Amino acid sequence: MSRTKQTASKALGGKAPRKGISAKSIPSSGCSPAMPKRTRFKAGALALKEIRKYQKSTDLLIRKRPFQRMVRDLCKGREGVRFQASAIVAFQEAVENFLTSLMEDAYRCVLHAKRVTLMPKDICLVYKIKYANILYAALD
């Protein structure tokens, strides 16, 4: 191979060009290796599939162990507080029911504002409208 001179040029950045596949590297057997082709979904299709899955199920959405740890951590300062396993499961169901209804109402606020994205201000609005009497009763 003969050497050639190259002049210095300014690098423009970006990706390097892809190298083509040479004819020697392709197997001559004619069959291509069986690789499963991944299916591409439309944008948002997987999210809708996941929503339908969770709407059909009656399982708890928050994992039990992390929730149990959080409850025990919140009650750590109190002496002699103990929990039965069934009490923690009942508390978890109540919390998930509360959060689900809060998110449903917040999404109604999103639709009312003619938006698609749920924002923190929607959750704050629902909390102020729905639970204002509880909040102010606790302050008195």
Curated annotation (Swiss-Prot):
Pfam families: Histone. One of its GO terms (cellular component) is nucleus. The modification N6-acetyllysine is found at K10, K15, K19, K24, K56, K64. InterPro entries: Histone-fold (IPR009072), Histone_H2A/H2B/H3 (IPR007125), Histone_H3/CENP-A (IPR000164). The modification N6,N6-dimethyllysine is found at K5, K15. SMART domains: H3. The modification N6-methyllysine is found at K5, K10, K19, K24. Residues 1-36 are annotated as: Disordered. One of its GO terms (molecular function) is DNA binding. Gene3D superfamilies: Histone, subunit A. Mono-, di- and trimethylated to form H3K4me1/2/3. H3K4me activates gene expression by regulating transcription elongation and plays a role in telomere length maintenance. H3K4me enrichment correlates with transcription levels, and occurs in a 5' to 3' gradient with H3K4me3 enrichment at the 5'-end of genes, shifting to H3K4me2 and then H3K4me1. Keywords: Acetylation, Chromosome, DNA-binding, Methylation, Nucleosome core, Nucleus. The modification N6,N6,N6-trimethyllysine is found at K5. It is found in: Nucleus; Chromosome. The nucleosome is a histone octamer containing two molecules each of H2A, H2B, H3 and H4 assembled in one H3-H4 heterotetramer and two H2A-H2B heterodimers. The octamer wraps approximately 147 bp of DNA. Belongs to the histone H3 family. Core component of nucleosome. Nucleosomes wrap and compact DNA into chromatin, limiting DNA accessibility to the cellular machineries which require DNA as a template. Histones thereby play a central role in transcription regulation, DNA repair, DNA replication and chromosomal stability. DNA accessibility is regulated via a complex set of post-translational modifications of histones, also called histone code, and nucleosome remodeling. PANTHER family: HISTONE H3-LIKE CENTROMERIC PROTEIN A, HISTONE H3.2. This is Histone H3-like protein. It comes from Encephalitozoon cuniculi (strain GB-M1) (Microsporidian parasite).
